[in-house]
């Protein structure tokens, strides 16, 4: 199997899993792999994958997005993407103005049409887990699985794989991202980077 682009529609991992299991096939449209018996979709993420898809539902990280978050606090941020340092500074700002949390989370959703109901649900999670970096990662995972209408997410690297059911609650999504390697939402990317 020759890989013809840097981001092929069907990667080696998908090809391997579909070849090994007779009930799996390639999904049309949303999702990477589908269970042919149940029609349940499994999103497949390889090395350095983002919590985003190839459709227009997802928005790209840029400096103006981060600026809009810091402008809520009437201060300027020195960041051009969302990383752990940026999240830590926002955590400190939120200590003095916790009422801004739902708006911060709304702006850090990686979809072009943010959902305030999702922001409020993850704001409640933040009250229990005051760790903005992982809360935003959990929120992006939760949204990604909703947008893709996927039942599972399967992550692989050169040494193994793991699979999770679609998170049903913010707490489920938080548990998943804390068990994985979550990295920054880089300029130009459409979501935070995740892997095993």
Language model segments and positions:
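Low-complexity, compositionally biased segments
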Residues: 17, 35-38, 160
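Acidic-basic catalytic patches of nuclease active cores, encompassing PD-(D/E)XK
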Residues: 1-27
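Catalytic cores of nucleic-acid endonucleases
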Residues: 26, 46-163
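Conserved catalytic cores of phosphodiester-cleaving nucleases, focusing on short active-site segments
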Residues: 33-48
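C-terminal or late-domain output modules
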Residues: 164-196
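Intrinsically disordered, compositionally biased, charge-dense segments
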Residues: 24, 41, 161-163, 196
